[in-house]
Amino acid sequence: MIFKLIIKPKGMGHYLKIRRKLKRKKPEFLRTNWYRKKAFRNDPKWRWGHGRDNKFRLKMKGKPRPPEPGYRSPRKVRGLLPNGLKPVIIHNVEELTKIKEGEIAVIHHAVGKRKRQQILEKAKELSIPIANPVL
């Protein structure tokens, strides 16, 4: 008897839910001695330990976990916003016309007030969603 394996294609919402669950469980990756030095406390980005006796590097019990590939989100939703749209950085009105369905505009931080206002008006005409519409 031959059994057929039926795989149903899962939608984007399914993978977004999985990513949300994984992110809840993911620890905050802190560098070595983050609690000792004020500079490390204020800028707690991950740095791998290089010392000979570094307990983080040796992955000793009781020490924080280092970042590993297992903590990554599903490939289909990697780089997407929580609403499932892909962010596209916009610098001017012309770039706004190149946005496709399934993408959301993000106005670049260096765009001034006047140009930002023009982009917002054009986006309203074309009914394109904008992630950071605040003036």
Curated annotation (Swiss-Prot):
Q: Which GO terms describe its molecular function?
A: structural constituent of ribosome
- Protein keywords: Ribonucleoprotein, Ribosomal protein
Region Disordered: start-end pairs? 51-77
GO BP terms, alphabetized: translation
Q: Which GO terms describe its cellular component?
A: cytosolic large ribosomal subunit
Checking Pfam families in the record gives: Ribosomal_L32e (PF01655)
**Cysteine pairings via disulfide bonds:** none
Query: HAMAP family, from UniProt?
Result: Ribosomal_eL32
The record's listing under NCBIfam families reads:
PRK08562.1
Question: Would you tell me the protein name for this molecule?
Answer: Large ribosomal subunit protein eL32
Organism lineage string:
Archaea, Nanobdellota, Candidatus Nanoarchaeia, Nanoarchaeales, Nanoarchaeaceae
Name the encoding gene, please.
Answer: rpl32e
